[in-house]
Amino acid sequence: MVKPGDEFRVEYLDWTGGQIKNDDNANDIRDVDLTQVHYLSGPIGVEGAEPGDLMVVDILDVGVLKESEWGFTGLFAKENGGGFLTEHYPEANKACWDFHGIYASSRHIPGVEFAGIMHPGLIGCLPSKELLDEWNEREGGLVATAPDRVPPLATLPSEETAVMGRMKKDEAAAAAKEAARTVPPREHGGNCDIKNLSRGSRVFFPVYVKDGGLSMGDIHFSQGDGEITFCGAIEMAGYLDVRVGLVKGGMKNYNVKNPIFQPSPLE
C-alpha cells in the first residue's frame, strides 16, 4: 500500500516471464506459452482510492536491470500468436539486442544501432466485477463470430494458467473462469503499447475498486507506432519509478470513463 504523493520503484520481469533466451534460434519464440503472459508487478493499492476517483500516475524514470542488459524482438508463428502481418510472415523469428546506455544493437541485424525510448507497454488499474463481466461478454461475442480463426479474434479466460494470488481451491477455480487476459487495452488501461509513455508522462486512470490496484509491466526498450508483429517492441526486464496521486470524484466531475495519457516530451 502506498499513499498519494509517494514516489517508489517497481521492478519487472520481461512480459514472457523469462521464456525467451539470448541465443541464436527462434525455437523459444515458436514455442512460447502465450497463456503465461503478461507478467506484471502489482496490484499496488493507493490509500484512499475509491471507485469514481481518478488515479494520477507520473512516470519519473524507466530503466534496465543490471543483471539483464539485453532484450528481444519476435515474430510469432501464425499458429501461436501470429501478428497483423502473419499472412505474409507466418514463421517464427527473433532478434536479440544488447544495450549500451541509451543505445541498442543486434548481432542479428548487423549495422543497426539506435537510441531507445524506454516505456511500459502495460499499465492500469483493476476492473470492478461489473466491468469484468462486460469484457467477457464483449470478447466472447467477438470470438463467437469466427470461432475457428487462427489466430483468434480475442483471448478468453484461461482456467489452467490464471494467476489467482492468495485465492484457494473453489474460490480460485471460480475466479479463473472469468479472469481477464491482458492482451487488449480496455477501459482500465492495460496493454496500450504507447511508445512515448516514458519519463515525463502522466496518466489519469479511472478507479473501479477500493485502493485502485495499480499494475504495470511489459517494459520496452523501444517500439514503433504499435506492435505489428505482436512482439514488435524490444522487450526487456526493467524498472519504473513512479509517483501516484488522486483526483477525488474525478470520473464524474470530468466525465472520464477511460484513461487519459499525457505523452512524454521525449522523442
Segments and roles (model prediction):
Residues 15-26, 62-73, 211-221:
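Short, Lys/Arg- and Gly-enriched loop/turn segments at beta-strand edges
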Residues 1-32:
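N-terminal, Lys/Arg-enriched amphipathic/low-complexity engagement segments
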Residues 5, 49-52, 200:
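Loop/turn positions that initiate beta-strands
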Residues 10, 54-57, 205:
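A generic structural signal for residues embedded in beta-strands
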Residues 1, 38-44, 187-192:
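Short alpha-helix capping/helix-loop boundary micro-motifs
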Residues 61-199, 204:
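Intrinsically disordered, low-complexity linker/loop segments enriched in Gly/Pro
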Residues 146-175, 186, 194-198, 202-267:
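Extended, low-polarity segments enriched in aliphatic/aromatic residues
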